[in-house]
């Protein structure tokens, strides 16, 4: 067995992502088992998109390279309104998940989800960031409408 295969085997036994996999993968600090679950979720999201068309909301943290997705949104907006892409800036609106309905998706831009914030929480009633609850470091953000 080669040294590389031995290293991969050791990583698998230690529940770590093997170095050759990590070189061609998205960044992850998760142990191997959680990494595989996460990767399967990403593949299911992409497969559903391919088979059923664009979703009404996009799992932003499920993308390997989010910058290309955001650039694609800008390109679509620029083509639709014949505007130079470098003149387009982002605005956003944090949605209230209690009343949010994506329907067919955003007319322009995209609804996104899957973002987390550290050391604070989103107060839907006030529409702003608040102190986090005791002993809670990360909180999930509601859907966000990215508007070019």
Q: Model features per residue range: what roles?
A:
Residues 1-148:
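Long C-terminal appendages of very large multidomain proteins
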């Amino acid at each position: 067995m080669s040294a590389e295969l031995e290293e991969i085997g050791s990583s698998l036994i230690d529940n770590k992502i093997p170095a050759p996999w990590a070189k061609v993968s998205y960044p992850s600090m998760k142990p191997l088992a959680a990494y595989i679950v996460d990767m399967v979720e990403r593949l299911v999201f992409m497969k559903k998109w391919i088979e059923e068309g664009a979703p009404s909301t996009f799992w932003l943290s499920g993308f390997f390279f989010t910058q290309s997705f955001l650039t694609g949104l800008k390109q679509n907006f620029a083509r639709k309104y014949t505007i130079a892409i470098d003149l387009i800036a982002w605005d956003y609106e944090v949605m209230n998940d209690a009343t949010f309905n994506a329907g067919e998706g955003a007319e322009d831009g995209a609804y996104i989800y899957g973002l987390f914030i550290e050391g604070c929480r989103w107060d839907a009633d006030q529409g702003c960031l608040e102190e986090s609850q005791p002993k809670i470091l990360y909180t999930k953000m509601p859907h966000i409408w990215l508007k070019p």
